[in-house]
């Protein structure tokens, strides 16, 4: 609606009003009614234009009423277990076991918790799930012999479903590139091997960490040779 149309409507409304003789009081009343009518028409026209062109509109909700669309994603990232009841184990090597790698849990900084067992030098998994499996060994030698030295470290699994020993993680290292010359000083060497990975395990699975040359193990310091699992 244009401005000329609004003015014409106001003039028609003034002509339609009955003319009264009463002096200034009647004129003021007519002026008030005319102004009031003009404001109503102008306000309605402005509101229509704003709604029509989308300047204003119905308020939209900033947040969805139903948060169930978000909750599954948040729940997916959380574990059904609390940190206090997750199976965990950390065993250390027995420094007094000559010629073999024997794991112990009754030592400082060693533990078995929430169902994990140490049986026949193997860790027994108490429940199905994802587990972090890790182990470290440290080899030490003096000089290099004429024969090539190969050091291996392997983590194996015997699953309850097929009862076959399968290597999960394995590494091979050779600390000596050449033989120590005759008459030369035999210098010491150190060779650490660390293994770690995440695997899906079943209840009752047995895990072992083994080496091929226990005679080269270094037990000089605690915390150098260990084996463990952590439920995720």
From Swiss-Prot:
Q: Where does the record place the site Cleavage?
A: 34-35, 39-40, 49-52, 76-77
Residues passing through the membrane, by range:
35-57
Q: How does it get modified after it is made?
A: The soluble form derives from the membrane form by proteolytic processing. The membrane-bound form is further proteolytically processed by SPPL2A or SPPL2B through regulated intramembrane proteolysis producing TNF intracellular domains (ICD1 and ICD2) released in the cytosol and TNF C-domain 1 and C-domain 2 secreted into the extracellular space.
Q: Which GO terms describe its cellular component?
A: extracellular space; plasma membrane
* Keyword Transmembrane attached: yes
Carries keyword Zinc-finger? no
Any idea where the THD domain is? 87-232
Q: Which residues have a glycan attached per UniProt?
A: 79
Location(s), subcellular: Cell membrane
* Disulfide linkage: 144-176
Residues with the Phosphoserine modification: 2
Q: Where is the lipid attached (N6-myristoyl lysine)?
A: 19-20
The processes (GO biological process) annotated in the record are: extrinsic apoptotic signaling pathway via death domain receptors; immune response; necroptotic signaling pathway; negative regulation of protein-containing complex disassembly; positive regulation of apoptotic process; positive regulation of canonical NF-kappaB signal transduction; positive regulation of extrinsic apoptotic signaling pathway; positive regulation of JUN kinase activity
SMART domains associated with the record: TNF (SM00207)
| Alphabetically ordered keywords of this record | Cell membrane, Cytokine, Disulfide bond, Glycoprotein, Lipoprotein, Membrane, Myristate, Phosphoprotein, Secreted, Signal-anchor, Transmembrane, Transmembrane helix
Question: Residue ranges, Cytoplasmic compartment?
Answer: 1-34
Tell me where it mainly resides. Answer: membrane
Q: Which family does it belong to?
A: Belongs to the tumor necrosis factor family.
What is the stated purpose of this protein?
Answer: Cytokine that binds to TNFRSF1A/TNFR1 and TNFRSF1B/TNFBR. It is mainly secreted by macrophages and can induce cell death of certain tumor cell lines. It is potent pyrogen causing fever by direct action or by stimulation of interleukin-1 secretion and is implicated in the induction of cachexia, Under certain conditions it can stimulate cell proliferation and induce cell differentiation. Induces insulin resistance in adipocytes via inhibition of insulin-induced IRS1 tyrosine phosphorylation and insulin-induced glucose uptake. The TNF intracellular domain (ICD) form induces IL12 production in dendritic cells.
The record's section on PANTHER family has: TUMOR NECROSIS FACTOR (PTHR11471:SF23), TUMOR NECROSIS FACTOR FAMILY MEMBER (PTHR11471)
Assembly description: Homotrimer. Interacts with SPPL2B.
The name of this protein is Tumor necrosis factor
| Organism annotation | Pan troglodytes (Chimpanzee)
């Amino acid at each position: 609606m244009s401005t000329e149309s609004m003015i014409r409507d106001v003039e028609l409304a003034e002509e339609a009003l009955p003319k009264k003789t009463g002096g200034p009081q009647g004129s003021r009343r007519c002026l008030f009614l005319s102004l009031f009518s003009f404001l109503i028409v102008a306000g309605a026209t402005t509101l229509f234009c704003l709604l029509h062109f989308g300047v204003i509109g119905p308020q939209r909700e900033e947040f969805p009423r139903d948060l169930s669309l978000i909750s599954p994603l948040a729940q997916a990232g959380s574990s059904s277990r609390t940190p206090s009841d997750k199976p965990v184990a950390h065993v250390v090597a027995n420094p007094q076991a000559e010629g073999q790698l024997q794991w112990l849990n009754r030592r400082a900084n060693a533990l078995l918790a929430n169902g994990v067992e140490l049986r026949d030098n193997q860790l027994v998994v108490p429940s199905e799930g994802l587990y972090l499996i890790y182990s470290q060994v440290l080899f030490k030698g003096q000089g290099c012999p004429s024969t090539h030295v190969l050091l291996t470290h392997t983590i194996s699994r015997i699953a309850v479903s097929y009862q076959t020993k399968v290597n999960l993680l394995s590494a091979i290292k050779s600390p000596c590139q050449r033989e120590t010359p005759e008459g030369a000083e035999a210098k010491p060497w150190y060779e650490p091997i660390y293994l770690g990975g995440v695997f899906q395990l079943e209840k009752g699975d047995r895990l072992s960490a083994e080496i091929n040359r226990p005679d080269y193990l270094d037990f000089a310091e605690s915390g150098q040779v260990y084996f463990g699992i952590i439920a995720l």
